């Protein structure tokens, strides 16, 4: 019986407890002049994630999405969304947990953030903006490689 209980405790667990918008901002610093010009924007997307342990096996993950649209030299709009979620994640190894917090959870949050961005841009009366899907698994793998490369010279110096 104790063996069964140990197996149950070690079984991977993943549950979404809540998904919510933590912060939003939409700015049109050069309005109304921006509406009088030919629309040929350059759109820049910045992403960031962070996670916080709230309790045993309970984590908040925040995906920050910043979209900046420039029309020529002027900023047409700046849209910022912090989409968050509270997740129950247990029974994972440290690398599995890091991947869940850095890639899997942001994959869940991104469609909500994308919808918020599209809605704010539309309400700002700009042409529709649909953000392309993001491969958070690839971004996380790149982050892990960069950390490993940054740690390598330190290890060589200590040898």
From Swiss-Prot:
The cross-references to SUPFAM superfamilies, in alphabetical order and at most eight, read: SecB-like (SSF54611)
Which keywords accompany this UniProt record? Chaperone, Cytoplasm, Protein transport, Translocation, Transport
* Places the protein is found: Cytoplasm
GO terms assigned for molecular function: unfolded protein binding
Highest taxon, organism lineage: Bacteria
Among its keywords, does the record have Protein transport? yes
Q: Mainly localized where?
A: cytoplasm
User: Record keywords: Protein transport included?
Assistant: yes
One Gene Ontology cellular component term attached to this UniProt record is: cytoplasm
**Coiled coil spans:** none
Entry's NCBIfam families? PRK05751.1-4, secB
Q: How does it assemble?
A: Homotetramer, a dimer of dimers. One homotetramer interacts with 1 SecA dimer.
User: What role does it play?
Assistant: One of the proteins required for the normal export of preproteins out of the cell cytoplasm. It is a molecular chaperone that binds to a subset of precursor proteins, maintaining them in a translocation-competent state. It also specifically binds to its receptor SecA.
Its family? Belongs to the SecB family.
Q: What is this protein called?
A: Protein-export protein SecB
């Amino acid at each position: 019986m104790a063996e069964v209980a140990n197996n149950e405790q070690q079984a991977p667990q993943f549950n979404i407890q809540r998904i919510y918008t933590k912060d939003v901002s939409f700015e049109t610093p050069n309005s109304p002049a921006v509406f009088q010009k030919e629309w040929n924007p350059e759109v820049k997307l910045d992403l960031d994630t962070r996670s916080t342990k709230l309790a045993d096996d309970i984590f908040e993950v925040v995906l920050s999405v910043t979209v900046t649209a420039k029309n020529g030299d002027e900023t047409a709009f700046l849209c910022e969304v912090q989409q968050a979620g509270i997740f129950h994640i247990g029974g994972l190894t440290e690398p599995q947990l890091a991947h869940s917090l850095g890639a899997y959870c942001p994959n869940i949050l991104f469609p909500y953030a994308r919808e918020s961005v599209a809605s704010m841009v539309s309400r700002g009366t700009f042409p529709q903006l649909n953000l392309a899907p993001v491969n958070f698994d690839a971004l996380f793998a790149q982050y892990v490689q960069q950390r490993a490369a940054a740690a390598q010279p330190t290890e060589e110096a200590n040898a």
